[in-house]
Amino acid sequence: MAGLRYSVKVYVLNEDEEWNNLGTGQVSSTYDEQFQGMSLLVRSDSDGSVILRSQIPPDRPYGKYQETLIVWYEAENQGLVLKFQDPAGCQDIWKEICQAQGKDPSIQTTVNISDEPEEDFNEMSVISNMVVLPDCELNTLDQIADIVTSVFSSPVTDRERLAEILKNEAYIPKLLQLFHTCENLENTEGLHHLYEIIKGILFLNEACLFEIMFSDECIMDVVGCLEYDPALDQPKRHRDFLTNDAKFKEVIPITNSELRQKIHQTYRLQYIYDILLPVPSIFEDNFLSTLTTFIFSNKAEIVSMLQKDHKFLYEVFAQLKDETTHDDRRCELLFFFKELCSFSQALQPQSKDALFETLIQLGVLPALKIVMIRDDLQVRSAAAVICAYLVEYSPSRIREFIISEAHVCKDSDLFINVIIKQMICDTDPELGGAVHLMVVLHTLLDPRNMLTTPEKSERSEFLHFFYKHCMHKFTAPLLAATSEHNCEEDDIAGYDKSKNCPNDNQTAQLLALILELLTFCIQHHTFYIRSYILNKDLLRKALILMNSKHTHLILCVLRFMRRMICLNDEAYNNYIIKGNLFEPVVNALLDNGTRYNMLNSAILELFEYIRVENIKPLVSHIVEKFYNTLESIEYVQTFKGLKIKYEKERDRQSQIQKNLHSVLQNIVVFRGTIEEIGLEEEICFMEDAGEVVMPPLEDDDEFMETKRTQEGEAVMPPLEDDDKFTETKRTHQEGEAVMPPLEDDDEFMETKRNQEHEGKVDSPKRTSSGDFKFSSSYSACAAIGTGSPSGSSVVRLVDHPDDEEEKEEDEEEKEEDKEDETSPKKKPHLSS
């Protein structure tokens, strides 16, 4: 077989470990006189020059891979590869090499791994992983497809090498030329191979290849290749759609050719990504990341070019705000802005802010207000999308514009009320526009994105504005849907169920949207929404919807009520209890019967929440009003648990009442003691001043009994005729200053007169008030010879150095004694 020639490509590994193509030629194995042995000789196809002359020494390791590659190293870091066009030629040359080295040609490598250094084997492995593409011809399309599809299971370096070959050898234009050939020949097999090849190249995810494939010269041919999916019976005519159906409209003539070309390219790229390429799995997301980035980059460039052209944008806004602009023209202008806002999502935050700031300054909000009241559904939908973009960008700027209108517009003409009206009047059966506008309202009403500064509180200002000017319009559909069912306050569920409930599907969806936003308001607008709900009796009216045939609407009502209960607000709890607003909920549970569904679970969860959180007013209300009705529900322990909570609280309150009654009794007794102590302190104070004023002597037994109970005070017991003096003396010795009974017998009076003269003790004088007044040099206890002057209960001594005054007092005392002898007998009670 010596002398046979086979077509090959010769590659050499450079210092950077990259493969360089030395050229294409014919290889043969011949005897070389210079080397005195067999060698491989490759001559160029173009000029017959020698591309490669390589000796085949007996100890050099060779390897055969992929049926078309023979690889070896001639020196360190100098790898060589012969890439055969025909596997048969590769096998023939491989036999020549094995024969020259005395090896078995059935093996895939001439090196014995156990005998060679590990680094030599690793070098062979590097060469064996080399990717080499055959010539781009019809009969090699299957090989090319195999290489491109198999490279994804190889290391990343192989994919990079393949991308480098495709770029450097202008392989993609050659493939697209073959596409035209196959299409002309109706070569279906070749077209299927081209589909796999082009799809594989796209999944290489290389920006340098995208630049080639998506150029004006190549992009439509790429689309053509992707039409021939082997999984389809007939190819899809995507090129016809892009060429004939997808018309590019310039709302304002674009003079920048680069901008126009970029717009065309981006549209087609998006079409390829969305329509032609299969949706990647979660493991293949990164395969198209560069393509996504490529599209985003294009969009950012388009937006930047338009943003710089102020004349272009000004003209667009002028026509959009012009009342005389035709509806079709206005629709085109609005769609342009919709695409512009969509493209803006590809911008960096700083660039996006600059764009929307430009749009707001040019008057996009007044323009939207004009188009949102048009009859065209497409126009209103596009306006809703644009509005959502603007609110997402800067809700504060939109709120500022809305509040500024209050001074120049009627309530019905306010921008936010226009939004509410369009949401309510959305004619789309699926309420697509209403959903967009609900998102807008939700963002505007979210206090978490409201600014608060020392000078201004956006939250209070905007919410006050909204609840004053807008809330009644927002809730109008809810109030209208329930107005025919207004019932007595104590019987919300007493209306005729045969009356029209909002059973229309579209109306039910709208009411559900309204209730969802009201639920959000309960959570975030505590004061404002509470006042509105209580004033409008909103929960009662919402609960009328519990009779709707739409379960999703009933669940919205339950969420609305549950959010209210979650706050555990006293005003809400009282409102629910006084209005008996649990009745429609209980009725709905009973009407649902034994069906285990979302409605059943939602209602049970509501009661379970009340039980777990132990909201005491609601627990008591539910048990007292509904336990007899709910007692039969035993498949959950919720209602029994509520009864247990109720009984525990009742017992606790009963115990508290008992304890409180006992405390109140103690307080009454304590107050009496305090009053007595106060009286004692008053007497002591007057004693300190030099005189003791005794209160009037009372005959009332109760009064005297109270006085006797006071300890540590000077007590004058009642005058008795019996022998109680001894007992009085004993009491005095125990620490109390007690006056003995004043006796009428002669012996007692004689003794008393002697004591008065001996001790110079002045007898008490009656004051004008009827009290006794002591002003002696000894205490009352000393006057009867008992007690100690230093005792705590002894009346303090008051000195009277003037003897003349004492004599006068003695004389007065004698006169009083005479009067006592002649006057009727009376037993005075002395007590401090």
Curated annotation (Swiss-Prot):
Pfam families noted in UniProt:
EVH1_PP4R3, PP4R3
Which protein family is named in the record? Belongs to the SMEK family.
**Extent of Low complexity compositional bias:** 769-779
Bias (Basic and acidic residues): 725-735, 749-765
Region ranges (Disordered): 708-832
Q: What is this protein called?
A: Protein PPP4R3C
Instruction: Please name the GO terms of the biological process aspect recorded for this protein, alphabetically.
Output: DNA damage response; regulation of double-strand break repair
User: Under the GO molecular function aspect, what terms does this record hold?
Assistant: protein phosphatase activator activity
Lineage top rank: taxon:
Eukaryota
**Which InterPro entries does the UniProt entry name for this protein?**
ARM-type_fold, EVH1_PP4R3, P4R3-like_central_dom, PH-like_dom_sf, PP4R3-like
| GO CC aspect terms | nucleoplasm; protein phosphatase 4 complex
Sequence ranges of Acidic residues compositional bias: 801-820
